[in-house]
């Protein structure tokens, strides 16, 4: 969208300022080269600007141009739990030895309450309060829950209570299990107490939240 707007302004001779483009192709792998490149002295002058406009965002719809004023950050990590030094038979050891998959499932299950609220003490301490006026502006966007559900293939939307879908997408932090593994998952069945379990977990963070603190 921004590129087409630039193209139009050049074509109509209405461009009011200089414009610099930075194309970065490593976002999906964590942008390992970008930070190092940006801090080089010879690039600081090249990148100097009054305003930065990020194009890696969505539009409300393909017919409604959108400018995002913020993006949620990310805190991600892997949690690994260990139990016995090898898998055990649940008929012989069930009820006497802690099962890492059971414990991991319980731990993950305590992070969110029934209203979609993250229960970790202090998690929301630094979350900026969005004013009623700002929330009203967010919800003026032409958006439909029904269309959204259809686009992602679900019948019911889920999320933090007392916030709209647009608010939950943009101004509220979230917790998600990105992957979980443990025990036997092959063909057939093995009645075991697994020796370990792990999960890949992520938090989407909002303005003022520090991923190191989280």
Question: What are the residue ranges of the model-derived segments?
Answer:
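Glycine/acidic-rich beta-strand-loop module
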Residues: 21, 174-205
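Structured core elements
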Residues: 54, 78-80, 119, 176-179, ...
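Fold-independent oxyanion-binding glycine-rich loops
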Residues: 25-26, 55-58, 81-84, 180-182
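Acidic/histidine-rich catalytic neighborhood of metal-dependent amide-processing enzymes
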Residues: 1-70
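Short small-residue beta-strand/loop micro-motif enriched in glycine and branched aliphatics
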Residues: 85-91, 186-187
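Flexible glycine/proline-rich, aromatic-decorated loop/lid segments
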Residues: 66-82
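Alpha-helical metal-binding/catalytic segments enriched in His/Glu/Asp
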Residues: 1-30, 77-81, 94-114, 201
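Acidic-enriched catalytic cores of C-N bond-cleaving enzymes acting on peptides and small amides
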Residues: 44-45, 60, 69, 90-182, ...
């Amino acid at each position: 969208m921004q590129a087409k707007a630039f193209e139009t302004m050049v074509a109509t001779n209405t461009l009011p300022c200089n414009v610099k483009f930075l194309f970065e192709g490593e976002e999906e792998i964590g942008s390992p080269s970008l930070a190092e490149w940006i801090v080089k002295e010879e690039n600081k002058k090249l990148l100097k600007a009054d305003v930065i406009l990020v194009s890696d965002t969505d539009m409300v719809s393909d017919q409604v141009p959108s400018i995002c004023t913020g993006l949620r950050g990310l805190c991600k990590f892997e949690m690994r739990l260990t139990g016995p030094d090898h898998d055990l038979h649940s008929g012989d050891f069930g009820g006497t030895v802690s099962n890492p998959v059971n414990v991991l499932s319980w731990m993950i299950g305590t992070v969110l309450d029934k209203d979609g609220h993250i229960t970790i003490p202090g998690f929301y301490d630094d979350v900026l309060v969005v004013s009623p006026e700002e929330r009203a502006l967010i919800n003026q966007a032409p958006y439909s829950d029904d269309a959204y559900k259809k686009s992602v293939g679900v019948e019911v939307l889920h999320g933090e209570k007392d916030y709209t879908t647009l608010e939950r997408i943009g101004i509220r932090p979230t917790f998600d299990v990105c992957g979980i593994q443990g025990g036997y998952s092959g063909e057939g069945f093995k009645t075991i107490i697994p020796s370990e379990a792990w999960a890949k977990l992520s938090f989407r963070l909002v303005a003022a939240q520090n991923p190191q603190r989280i």
